[in-house]
From Swiss-Prot:
Residues annotated as binding substrate: 10-17, 23-24, 62, 89-92, 100, 116-117, 185-186
GO terms for MF: phosphoglycerate mutase activity
Enzyme class at the top of the EC tree: isomerase
SMART domains named in the record: PGAM
Species for this entry: Buchnera aphidicola subsp. Cinara cedri (strain Cc)
Pfam families found in the cross-reference section: His_Phos_1
Name of the gene this protein is made from: gpmA
Name of the protein in question: 2,3-bisphosphoglycerate-dependent phosphoglycerate mutase
Listed EC numbers: 5.4.2.11
Amino acid sequence: MKKKKIILMRHGESKWNKLNKFTGWQDIGLTKNGKKEAKLAAKLIKKNNFIFDIAYTSILKRAIYTLWIILKKTNQIWIPVYKSWKLNERNYGALEGLNKEKIKKKYGDEQVQLWRRSFTVCPPNLNISNKYHPIYDIKYKKLKKHELPTSESLEMTFNRVIPFWEFKILPQLEKNKNILIVAHGNSLRALIKYLGNISDSDIIDLDISTGKPLVYEFSNTNKPLKYYYL
């Protein structure tokens, strides 16, 4: 029986990553370096002979473009791809579009670290009059107003990512499918917290770099056995 494997990967560097801005739900494209990261990831995946049955990503183009590059470069563009807002980055509320260093100077390192890395703390809410509010984005027109976050903690992100894992992705793993998930720093932190049973206090130390394929191997009972970067 073949080993059950999933690759988790954060998108390549985005234009706002390069500018050190909070991005969240804003639909920002890749930099040249971000595209290069995706191509290098594809090279590693191909070198290690990973053949995928299915792929998942968010509805944000930095993740979608990264996935496209990987599938193209590994000659797997034909596999089924499913996109969901449930895999989006966490919503950074009123911080979206702002420079991280300027926010640190205004609020202090400790507060910004809590907003960025803690499990339960939310950034300030986004006002509905703000142009970055998701209500103005056509991608979310089918969602009800109460489903549109104006800010999210990692816990709130966890509460949308994990049901998607359990009801959409896990059934494919149970069928012995090899799966590729290209998502975002915090949607992946939420999933890794769940898979590794990481405590609320320890999750603050987990950071995920852009463009690095992380392999999870699972037992026949779908329990994580080990994980490693390619």
